[in-house]
Every structure is written in structure tokens, then in C-alpha cells.
Amino acid sequence: MDLDRLDLNPRIVAAVKKAKLRSVKEVLHLSGPDLQRRTHLSSPDVQLLLRASASLLRGHGVCTALHLLRQEGPFPEQHQRLSLGCPVLDALLRGGLPLDGITELAGRSSAGKTQLALQLCLAVQLPPRHGGLGAGAVYVCTEDAFPSRRLQQLIAQQQRLRADVPGHVISKIRFGHQIFIEHAADVDTLLQCVREKVPVLLARGMARLVVIDSVAAPFRCEFDGAALALRAQRLLALGAELRRLSCAFRSPVLCVNQVTEAVEEQDLVAGPPGMSPALGITWANQLLVRLLADRQRPEEAPLTPPGRTLRVVFAPHLPASSCSYTIAAEGVRGMPGTACS
């Protein structure tokens, strides 16, 4: 933070700059006696400096619920989102994925879950002014091989999808070099990856998005009905580690999930009738946002092309709502005028 914004005598500010302290945070990292030695200021001057620095960093005023709703609060970073690369989908999620917490994307096969995950891996690399975070992504595959051919197709079509981004910005980004791929076929490997490898990339600023595709696969393979307690324990461990990483590094976590055919009465965390995200209530409690990608089956509407819908099942900042989307060569696009609550 700029030292020139301090409401102090210019003599004190000049002494601070002469001591090669470049920001208010650096001032507050030092004790009063240390500041006296470095700046050669008197004790009263140092106390004035510390109080002014603390006030400037903390800020003033009251933040109301209306300010938060209008995104006018004193902490604008809490409103920052990762864009999905489509204005219609961003409008559905009020800007995109939140940076703190786990977002789940569940859905049937061929609904476009992996397509949207790949699109986010490219969107995160754009500068913040264009909805990105200016960093790469970690993509953890747990069942299928990484879809590299589709990724290359999306990279080649970025200018068509993101017409809002100047061409010279897109051309400077080496999209394929900033997606770090890991394979984890079992729960132990997945936990090891999340605990040891992913934090290194996040700490170095090389990645700001974590994708797990899919979270259900290793748990379905290793745990049968007799080991539900152990499965719940491992799910809790995975969820806690992902939430810790997301909050510590201000990085969104996207977990792709499978669905099961629901034969019992609909519950509060399930999706539309007949579909329920896998892993049950234990996993649902780890999530901040649950999205459901639904694809209409050919037998449900044989005379029309299969339709796709993205639904908000639950989120603390979003109402239950949905919109239709299509998948083209350039990526996933929401259909204008199809949003509903």
C-alpha cells in the first residue's frame, strides 16, 4: 500500500522512505523500537506512524448487507470470481466460480462436464480484467486419460469463444504449458497428490485452479457397502484438504462428480427426479456450490436435438436456477434467454 496515502507529517513519511520501507505492511511488521532505529524518528512520531498505518490498512466505515449485495463492500477481493468464459453462464453464477471453497459439477455421461472443466483451465490463465486469475491449473484425472486432443481444439478456438478478449492478449498466453496433469487411480494416490504435489504448484503461483475429474471414481472402486465408515473418513479428509488449499491460496476447486439413478424419494441435496450426485451426504457437506449438468436423452425427445441444462442445486450466494447450454467446437456456451429460477 502506498506510503503517500498516510495522513502524517511529510517529514515522517520521508523518514520512512529513507529507511527503505516500501509499504504500510512493512512498517507494521516492525516493532516500535525497530522503527526508531531504522527511521531515526522519536517515539511519539513512531506511535503516530503505527496508528496511521494500522488505520489505513484496516480501513474505515461500516459494511452493510446492501453493500455486499451490490458488491460495494470494503473487501472487493471477496467478490472476485473465476469466469466460465461465457457471459450467460457467468450471469447464472453471478460472475463465475467463487475462489474460496469446493464447487462440484455433477451430471450424466456426455453432459459436458469435462468440456466445462477444460474451458475453466483456459479461462483461469487470462488476466483478472478478463475474468481469469493469471495462472495455470492442476488437472487430476482419476478414471479416463486426459483429453489432450480436445484441449488443443479448445486452445485453437479461444479467439472465437472469447471475442471479448483482445487477440494480442490471447496470442501471448501459452495455454498448453500451464495445465499440470496428474493421474490418481486410487484414493491413496489422490490424497497424496492433493497433500504434496498440488500445494507446491499453488504456493509458487504456477496454478490457481484445481480440477479433480472425477472425485467419485476412486471411492466407488475401492469401497463396498461394508466399508462405508472408512469411505466417509477418507472423503472427509479429502474435502478438508481441498477446502484448506482453496482458502489458503484463494484458488477455486472444481470437482467433477458422477450421478446415480435415484430410486428413493428425492432428498435435499439431489438433483432432478431420477438423478442423485454420487458419494452421498458426507461429500455434499464438504461443498460450497453444487452444479448439475443435465442432458436430455434421445428417447425423452426423439424429434429434437438433445438439450443440455446447467442447474444451481445449492450455493450460499445463489438461488436455485438454471439455463440451457450448447457444446460447439470452440467450447461451452450458455443460450441467451433460457435462464429460469
From Swiss-Prot:
Record's subunit section: Interacts with RAD51C and RAD51. Part of the CX3 complex consisting of RAD51C and XRCC3; the complex has a ring-like structure arranged into a flat disc around a central channel; CX3 can interact with RAD51 in vitro. Forms a complex with FANCD2, BRCA2 and phosphorylated FANCG. Interacts with SWSAP1 and ZSWIM7; involved in homologous recombination repair. Interacts directly with PALB2 which may serve as a scaffold for a HR complex containing PALB2, BRCA2, RAD51C, RAD51 and XRCC3.
GO molecular function, one term: DNA binding
Residues reported to bind ATP: G107, R108, S109, S110, A111, G112, K113, T114
Cellular localization per UniProt: Nucleus; Cytoplasm; Cytoplasm, Perinuclear region; Mitochondrion matrix
CDD domains reported in the protein's UniProt record: XRCC3
Similarity section: Belongs to the RecA family. RAD51 subfamily.
Function: Involved in the homologous recombination repair (HRR) pathway of double-stranded DNA, thought to repair chromosomal fragmentation, translocations and deletions. Part of the RAD21 paralog protein complex CX3 which acts in the BRCA1-BRCA2-dependent HR pathway. Upon DNA damage, CX3 acts downstream of RAD51 recruitment; the complex binds predominantly to the intersection of the four duplex arms of the Holliday junction (HJ) and to junctions of replication forks.
Gene3D superfamilies registered for this protein in UniProt: P-loop containing nucleotide triphosphate hydrolases (3.40.50.300)
N-acetylmethionine: residues carrying this PTM: M1
Protein name: DNA repair protein XRCC3
Keyword terms, alphabetized: Acetylation, ATP-binding, Cytoplasm, DNA damage, DNA recombination, DNA repair, DNA-binding, Mitochondrion, Nucleotide-binding, Nucleus
InterPro entries given in the database record: DNA_recomb/repair_Rad51_C (IPR013632), DNA_recomb/repair_RecA-like (IPR016467), P-loop_NTPase (IPR027417), RecA_ATP-bd (IPR020588), XRCC3-like_C (IPR047348)
Biological processes, Gene Ontology terms: double-strand break repair via homologous recombination; double-strand break repair via synthesis-dependent strand annealing; positive regulation of mitotic cell cycle spindle assembly checkpoint; regulation of centrosome duplication; resolution of mitotic recombination intermediates; t-circle formation; telomere maintenance via recombination
GO CC aspect terms: cytoplasm; mitochondrial matrix; nucleus; perinuclear region of cytoplasm; Rad51C-XRCC3 complex; replication fork
